[in-house]
Amino acid sequence: MATSIARLSRRGVTSNLIRRCFAAEAALARKTELPKPQFTVSPSTDRVKWDYRGQRQIIPLGQWLPKVAVDAYVAPNVVLAGQVTVWDGSSVWNGAVLRGDLNKITVGFCSNVQERCVVHAAWSSPTGLPAATIIDRYVTVGAYSLLRSCTIEPECIIGQHSILMEGSLVETRSILEAGSVVPPGRRIPSGELWGGNPARFIRTLTNEETLEIPKLAVAINHLSGDYFSEFLPYSTVYLEVEKFKKSLGIAV
């Protein structure tokens, strides 16, 4: 009888010790447990409009507000400031800056100003010609070019990394090679190829070459249409749905 009582007392003491150990561990765990974050209800990411660029595309200056035609494509990270007009069918590509703070800048019909170009205009021109920067219709301005208070007549190609200074004039159906520098007041005659620093006459363009100039501008205009559709207020899924319906013979 005494042996049984001793065994029961030992079991009770052991169980009490085990309970105390577990209780101490649980208390320690509660103290070291990190506070749970307070979750808040917020719109899903597909319903939030994000803008990581941190820059403004259209910058009004005083009474002057840049004007962009409805069907003209202007890339999201382009800067248009002041007296800038972008006409129908034209395109201004990524990273270009058009500063119309001192005078007018015009990008004509179906012309294109490519990546990282800088277009500016001075108060006045030393040649007496208009100080505005005028890019007429069917003109292709290559990437990284710098244009300041110059006039480019219809159907011209300005090569990449070219510089056109104040008062320079590029007449119709002319081509300027890449890396060319046109000094102030220099005139590039019609139908000629010029290049170099400073720009010099190289040769006369053939009839076939002059006919290809507007075709290049039109091709770039068609390419800009693919980019233009990606920046509609809504996604372009409906375009794929319409194509799928047409492939099945369903009227859209």
From Swiss-Prot:
It is a peripheral membrane protein. Its main location: mitochondrion. Keywords: Membrane, Metal-binding, Mitochondrion, Transit peptide, Zinc. The keyword tRNA processing does not apply. GO terms for cellular component: mitochondrial membrane. InterPro entries: LbH_gamma_CA-like, Transf_Hexapept/Carb_Anhydrase, Trimer_LpxA-like_sf. Residues 1-29 form a transit peptide. One of its GO terms (molecular function) is metal ion binding. Coiled coil: none annotated. Substrate binds at R99, G100, D101, Q114, E115, R148, Q160, Y227. It is found in: Mitochondrion membrane. Zn(2+) binds at H120. It comes from the Eukaryota. Involved in complex I assembly in mitochondria and respiration. Belongs to the gamma-class carbonic anhydrase family. Component of the mitochondrial oxidoreductase respiratory chain complex I; element of the extra matrix-exposed domain, which is attached to the membrane arm of this complex. Interacts with GAMMACA2. This is Gamma carbonic anhydrase-like 1, mitochondrial. The lineage of its organism: Eukaryota, Viridiplantae, Streptophyta, Embryophyta, Tracheophyta. The gene is GAMMACAL1.
